[in-house]
């Protein structure tokens, strides 16, 4: 009965490099600003990713026909079982890349005999993604985004059989060689022969024996241990559809990682930092590629081009008025919270703080997620109304109570009838917060409670400084304060307030002018009426006087009239 077997040659650089341990003492200081309900945690050092370093790992599969083996020993069965597991792993990887051969062709090929495992470290970076990709693989790559574009470019090249043959041929007579790929990339390829020698000299002579006699169970165990890596690689790629992160020790062992770091075009300080920080693995990727009987995957490591510059984190919480009736308060919150790091004369701002990883007092951030700001942004902490930088805020009229856990304490925004306390696990409640924004350090405090929500404070060591000041929200008039401004600034809010005040002043002026006009008209009308009434009264008075005078005056006759009357009477 003809059977097949598999052997694996892992090409790795084993470089003995002394890497001194880096101790980062925690010297955190925290400043709480009562006026803006914010806190700044300082004392951190930067490790900002500015590029990628790409390495290539290839596993070459080939076949060999094995002599008839009729052995029934349990150890022989274990060997056969182990070979079958690897055959299934290879088939799964090929299926993942949609390059799975038919069952008949796979049966004709038989199980691959040898696996040549090489490590190739690229010496430059790439940023183009190939257009023609396998559908299943491409969909996942597009989901990752441009962060791994350089690794994808190399992965595309590895689909070309000629490129893989270049690597294979370069390693025929040497354990270390530089290969130039078709896209202009220079690849440093290295290998060692420890596993190859084991398979050739220890395993295959026993397995290929006619009766498959394996007298020592240690042979089986050692074979399982050495081949466990391929199984894990196949499992990780299968579960993650061709791209894995973080980078496991199966994808790249610690010795291999140190070897790659040693070859990176970075300073010794950067190499030391990368050698001792596990976050390097968390921020790395491995990208799979399969071509016929070659399994290849690209390992992409972060390059921290900016290190040891000061970093600080801004924490903010709602600041509301407390003197008004329930439902009529106004609130203001700084929206510029996140990580800040000095970078080449400016400040790199990372608004999504969770994208940065902290180890001790070292902050690992990706500059792809940052905004570049002027150094004047620091003025927002000490003088939010400064004229050099327009500080970012949001406004509302909803005074919701909450707490923000800082590096060495907690900010507590307590409003309305919510009960807010700080507690010690042994002494119970040690502080009750009044309405407003307050701060408590972690000295003697284990938890902070806001209503029914319990917060656990961090237990880092540091020094906290409470900077008192009048809450700036008290400077604003609730009647003209703009609400629901979610992406605003101090200048924009003040401008809207000034517009509202100007509108009110104009309304008052118009109202005043209308009142004055009405008053003048009323006076004129009243005056005219009074004059008319007076004139009428005067006319009536004169008429009455004249009439009365006429009625009361006797008739006086002259002498001539009287003489005429007398003569008339005598003549009769």
From Swiss-Prot:
Mutagenesis or variant effect for residue 114 to L: In strain: ATCC 51908
The keyword Protein transport is assigned to this record: no
Coiled coil: 76-96, 156-207, 479-514
Topology Extracellular: residue spans: 26-522
Cleavable signal peptide: 1-25
Family: Belongs to the paramyxoviruses fusion glycoprotein family.
Protein name per Swiss-Prot or TrEMBL: Fusion glycoprotein F0
Native source species: Bovine respiratory syncytial virus (strain A51908) (BRS)
Biological classification of the source: Viruses, Riboviria, Orthornavirae, Negarnaviricota, Haploviricotina
Gene: F
């Amino acid at each position: 009965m003809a059977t097949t077997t598999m052997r694996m040659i892992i090409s790795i650089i084993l470089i003995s490099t002394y890497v001194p341990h880096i101790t980062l003492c925690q010297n955190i200081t925290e400043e709480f600003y009562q006026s803006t309900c914010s806190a700044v945690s300082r004392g951190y050092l930067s490790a900002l990713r500015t590029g990628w370093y790409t390495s290539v790992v290839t596993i070459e599969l080939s076949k060999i026909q094995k002599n008839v083996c009729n052995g029934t020993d349990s150890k022989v069965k274990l060997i056969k079982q182990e070979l079958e597991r690897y055959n299934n792993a290879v088939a799964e990887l090929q299926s993942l890349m949609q390059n799975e051969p038919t069952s008949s062709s796979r049966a004709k090929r038989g199980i691959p005999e040898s696996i040549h495992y090489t490590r190739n470290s690229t010496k430059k970076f790439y940023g183009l993604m190939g257009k023609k990709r396998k559908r299943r693989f491409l969909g996942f790559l597009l989901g990752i985004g441009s962060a791994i574009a350089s690794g994808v470019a190399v992965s595309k090249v590895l689909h070309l059989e000629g490129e893989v043959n270049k690597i294979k041929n370069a390693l025929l007579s040497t354990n270390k060689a530089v290969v130039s790929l078709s896209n202009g990339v220079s690849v440093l390829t290295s290998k060692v022969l420890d596993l190859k020698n084991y398979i050739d000299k220890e395993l295959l002579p026993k397995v290929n024996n006619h009766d498959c006699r394996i007298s020592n169970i240690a042979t089986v165990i050692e074979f399982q241990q050495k081949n466990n890596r391929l199984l894990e690689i196949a499992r990780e790629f299968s579960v993650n559809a061709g791209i894995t992160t973080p980078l496991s020790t199966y994808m790249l062992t610690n010795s291999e990682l140190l070897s790659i770091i040693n070859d990176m075009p970075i300073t010794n300080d950067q190499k030391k930092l990368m050698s001792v920080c596990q976050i390097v693995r968390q921020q790395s990727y491995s990208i799979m590629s399969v071509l016929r009987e070659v399994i290849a995957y690209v390992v992409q490591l972060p390059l921290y081009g900016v290190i040891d510059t000061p970093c600080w984190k801004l924490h903010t919480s709602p600041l509301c008025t407390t003197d008004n009736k329930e439902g009529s308060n106004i609130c203001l919150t700084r929206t510029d919270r996140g990580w800040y790091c000095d970078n080449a004369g400016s400040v790199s701002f990372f608004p999504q703080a969770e994208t940065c990883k902290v180890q001790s007092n070292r902050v690992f951030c990706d500059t792809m997620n940052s905004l570049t700001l002027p150094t004047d942004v620091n003025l927002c902490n000490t003088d939010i109304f400064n004229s050099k930088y327009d500080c970012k805020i949001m406004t509302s009229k909803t005074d919701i109570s909450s707490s923000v856990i800082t590096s060495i304490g907690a900010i507590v925004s307590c409003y309305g009838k919510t009960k807010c306390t700080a507690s010690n696990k042994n002494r119970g409640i040690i502080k009750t917060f009044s309405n407003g924004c307050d701060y408590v350090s972690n000295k003697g405090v284990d938890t902070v409670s806001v209503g029914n929500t319990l917060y656990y404070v961090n237990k880092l060591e540091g020094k906290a400084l409470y900077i008192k000041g009048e809450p700036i929200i008290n400077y604003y008039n609730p009647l003209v304060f703009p609400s629901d401004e979610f992406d605003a600034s101090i200048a924009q809010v003040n401008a809207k307030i000034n517009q509202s005040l100007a509108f009110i002043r104009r309304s008052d002026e118009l109202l005043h002018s209308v009142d004055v006009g009405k008053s003048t008209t009323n006076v004129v009308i009243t005056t005219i009426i009074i004059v008319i009434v007076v004139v009428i009264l005067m006319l009536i008075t004169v008429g009455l006087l004249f009439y009365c005078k006429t009625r009361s005056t006797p008739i006086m006759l002259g002498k001539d009239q009287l003489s005429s009357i007398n003569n008339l009477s005598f003549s009769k």
